[in-house]
Amino acid sequence: MDAAIQYILYFAVLVVLAVPLGRFMAHIMDGEHTFLSPVIAPVERGVYRLLRIDAAEQMGCRRYLASVLVFSGIGLVALVALQALQSFLPGNPQHLPGVSWDLSFNTAASFITNTNWQSYSGETTLSYLVQFMGLTVQNFLSAGTGIAVMFALIRGFRQVKEQGLGSFWVDLTRTVLYVLIPLNLVFGICLAAGGVISNFQPAQKAELVEPVAVQPNADGGWSVIDGAQIEGDTVKVDGKVVEGARVVTEQFLPQGAAAPQVAIKQSGTNGGGFFGVNSAHPYENPSAFTNIIEMTSLLLIPAACCFTFGIGVKNTKQGKAIFAAMFILLVIFTGIIAVNEHMGTPQLADGGAVNIEMTDGQAGGNMEGKESRFGIATSSTWSAYTTAASNGSVNSMHDSYTPLGGFVQMLQMALGEVVFGGVGCGLYGMIGFAILTVFIAGLMVGRTPEFLGKKIEPGEMRWAVVLCLATPFAILVCSAIACMVPGLADQLNNGGAHGFSEVLYAFTSCGGNNGSAFAGMNCNIPWINVMLGLEMLFARFMPIIGTLAIAGSLAKKGKVAESAGTLSTTNGMFVFLLVFIVLLIGALSFFPALALGPVAEFFQMIA
């Protein structure tokens, strides 16, 4: 019963906060006066004067796209350079060396695309300067870019026989100044007050209560030696000296300005953790209070975008219908994950090895890879939220979820991040499916499809297909190529179906601009870093190209009057059709691959 209340609470908080934020963002899109205008409007005008931006400019789709690509390209180059020169720059109290070329490219591609895939551990790889001047800045700018493209799409539906979609520079500036900075100022203060660390001290060392013996392992790291007898610097097991063993007497305690970066990594659906284990780390997410802030902010802006869309196209029912479709999918997927994690696996219960019954003293179920301070309900909800959005942050280890739990996580990412998805990009991804839905419905009744008063013709359909299939194409092609590389098996912690799931999850995460990982695959080698980086760039910018092409085409068209034969896109039937089409495309595209991974593992589990 307590778990059910938790699930209801998480969903309710999301809906209650998303509605007013959606209205506020609609006002920002049109440059209307808001309660923040007296403070921020002078700053906004100053930015325009400094950068010589014409606030009244109307860009066509090609110029808008060129601005997006040039801006992102500059960010890519700057972030690569910042990492490469890390050892020569200030703000590096640990004296960390420069980052290798392949990891620099992978990380830069990851953060400018809002993916935040991490082939590294933040506390041991990147300096404070790179973290806040490089990664945190891109967290704001990549999120702002996604929202700006969504604004352009809204104007495409709203304009009548016009060329302009607004100005990318104005949309980006307003989004960052009015939405992202104020929102994350509040979140950052709340997180710091809740115990998330925020300082610029170098890492600390603490004496262990008891020394620990470790030895080198096959992965190049160190493993604890069970049953070791420690005599000074000598380690023995069963009276025999263990060669190459070390005695650890100190613990490494990382520090840094985590709270501000955690705030934007959540609300901007970025997801890249300040620490290697992300929001499972007690310095990044220490309590239930910080957890609900981080988890709610994860989907807040993507959910609000639905209501912004409805207000922007002057059809609030349409925004509610899109929200309903996304919300239904989220509830279904969260339920599947939760049920499987609460049930656990036969192997856990075999012979009474683990008590998987829920009691007052324990969560029961599959607690492997989950933090005891969060339990199954909170961990399952977070995993559903983070793979629904293009976020990828974690408060538990997805590699340790049950086969069907991992199946749902992969499926949500594989759908193209349309179950709310990323800030801005989730909305325009779902609009691609909505256009596909009205086209299929039009074929069934023999009418030219219409959506929001605009005729959907072959040009829009071609780009809608690109929008819907860019992610599946990137994921499946890159996964197939990787599986043909002979050395891939050496980078996996597991073989068989779960090993394939680790590969598929990595490429699904990057292709879906998500960034989470099963973490059972060593991705920090040159060819994998480069392949994942290229996949992230393709999967980010191909949908943007398709979205702006659709927006530019629709803006030139006139409005079509509704008639008795016009398909309603705001009722329950359309919501059902939209959900069905999303699941159908996902099933047709990914079931063969998923059958070789999590589905096969599920049948092995119950055999």
Model-predicted regions and their roles:
Residues 1-607:
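Membrane-proximal intracellular helices of multi-pass ion channels
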